[in-house]
UniProtKB/Swiss-Prot annotation:
Residues 106-122 have a biased composition (Basic and acidic residues). It comes from Rattus norvegicus (Rat). The modification Phosphoserine is found at residues 337, 341. The keyword Repeat applies. Its main location: membrane. One of its GO terms (cellular component) is postsynapse. It holds the Pfam family Na_Ca_ex. Residues 1-38, 155-179, 227-244, 288-506, 564-578, 633-639 are cytoplasmic. The chain crosses the membrane at residues 39-59, 134-154, 180-200, 206-226, 245-265, 267-287, 507-527, 543-563, 579-599, 612-632, 640-660. This is Sodium/potassium/calcium exchanger 2. Belongs to the Ca(2+):cation antiporter (CaCA) (TC 2.A.19) family. SLC24A subfamily.
Amino acid sequence: MDLHQSATVRLLQEWCSHESPSGCRRHYNTRKKLKLIRVIGLVMGLVAVSTVPFSISAFTETYSQNNRGEASDVTGPRAAPGHRQRTLLDLNDKIRDYTPQPPASQEDRSENGTDHAQGDYPKDVFSLEERRKGAIILHVIGMIYMFIALAIVCDEFFVPSLTVITEKLGISDDVAGATFMAAGGSAPELFTSLIGVFIAHSNVGIGTIVGSAVFNILFVIGMCALFSREILNLTWWPLFRDVSFYIVDLIMLIIFFLDNVIMWWESLLLLTAYFAYVVFMKFNVQVERWVKQMINRNKVVKVTVSEAQAKASTAGDKEEPTLPNKPRLQRGGSSASLHNSLMRNSIFQLMIHTLDPLAEELGSYGKLKYYDTMTEEGRFREKASILHKIAKKKCQVDENERQNGAANHVDYAAEKIELPNSTSTEVEMTPSSEASEPVQNGNLSHSIEAADAPQATETAEEDDDQPLSLSWPSNTRKQITFLIVLPIVFPLWITLPDVRKPASKKFFPITFFGSITWIAVFSYLMVWWAHQVGETIGISEEIMGLTILAAGTSIPDLITSVIVARKGLGDMAVSSSVGSNIFDITVGLPLPWLLYTIIHRFKPVTVSSNGLFCAIVLLFIMLIFVILSIALCKWRMNKILGFIMFGLYFAFLVVSVLLEDKVLECPVSI
């Protein structure tokens, strides 16, 4: 057994000696580069980028629009002349009667003379004139601060509490990823929509969700294509699955928007579409296998090893089941796999896991580069590649020493598996500095992740799902970051039990409901300050939602996708960008509408806006352009695809702002 362990470790060291140190430690460097200070810098960059549509909106403001805004205040809160529907005049008036008006709206309207919907906000300590003289900078800083606060409360408290709930309920990881974890990642958008319906009395929630959808699809994919270390090849199934559901949901939303009102049954249909997606994810593996069996009728190539190795492997492992049926590869219903996911890296990590139910065996065969996004056929090809490399290295181990080692599994897999034609794919492994470390349970990852002792220790600390710590950092940069986020983290640390601590795990209901309360507070402050910024600059809340709020609430999506893209997981990055929007469209929008109709005795919700309907149509068109662009790039995420995505995103921003300001007329409006 010692001979086998030494031979295995020597093989890995010899293989990694041909790679550059940076290549062997690429996973460590990836995670270190994405610190919170860089996240703050990224948020500031997004704010700077969003000033482009703001400038367009400011230049298009005219006195006629101000007069039109005053007229709209007389006729109704978001009902502009020329946009009231031909048969809905009386209906809109009735709905307006049920909408509570803020007490200070008349004073604000007389002072500002704008067409902003006056929500139930407290009176600002700064007057409009003071804000225009520079006090608005404080509101901008506060709004950005709320973006960071929402990301922290979701990542550190809300999602871990959802993880405990899924463990208690015994929900499979696919369903949990499409439900609880999707809710955790989209909580800011959901609460923004709730605030827009019940407090702001505007379409800020719709604008935020639509803008966030476009941001996730175009900007996030563009960033992944530009910042990935290499050209990434995409597979069709995850993209086809999520885009198909998303297209159906968007078509339903466009149809429901045609009359500018949302009935209770329309909201219910959108929620039903979401539950259909959850049911599909429950049977995703079976459906994927069936579809690929129907499509792929290729020849298979039987991968074998030498007769002596095959006999030795058979003798050592005759009692084991075949590789596809190994229980340890199955993620369905595994609470341990759910708990050990990289949730500290992002709040959408478990939703990304819904790409493939067998996606958690990343470390079980060395650092397999594309393992997380592979189907069974892809995994078999990956293991065959390992076998090929081991055969080339002439790693011969005595059959008497081959007991429960990693070589058993590789040889056995090669003997049992029949594969379609494929090319060899890359295997990334980290060399071991301690040749005597044992190989545990047939898992190479235990003996290959200690290449550099200090670096491995630091990375292990980052990887572990450790509870939140308020200990003082060591270097200056981390200390500055700590002081910036301390006003957010300290109240959360005091009021919410950290369920990642074994002693606090039983208090998960307190963490769950407490996190919801904090998310509601942060979302309210974010929308309020965004309203003040828009009122000062002279733009509507809809435009704020399409630009600043959409980008701010999508920061976790962006960080997650860039991380996985830099690890070589292109399918995760693209599919998570599309899949995260399904929850927003089918829950984030219809749930507040349905609650509103129930509270107001099934009265419909008005969603009239100058450009939001056309923005939804533009979102649908942009989705088609994304598919065509990926196809034109031959299903590869390269720099050209990144620049195409950026161009489409800025085109969407400019056109949406011009439509909302009525500089352009929406050609599809009725």
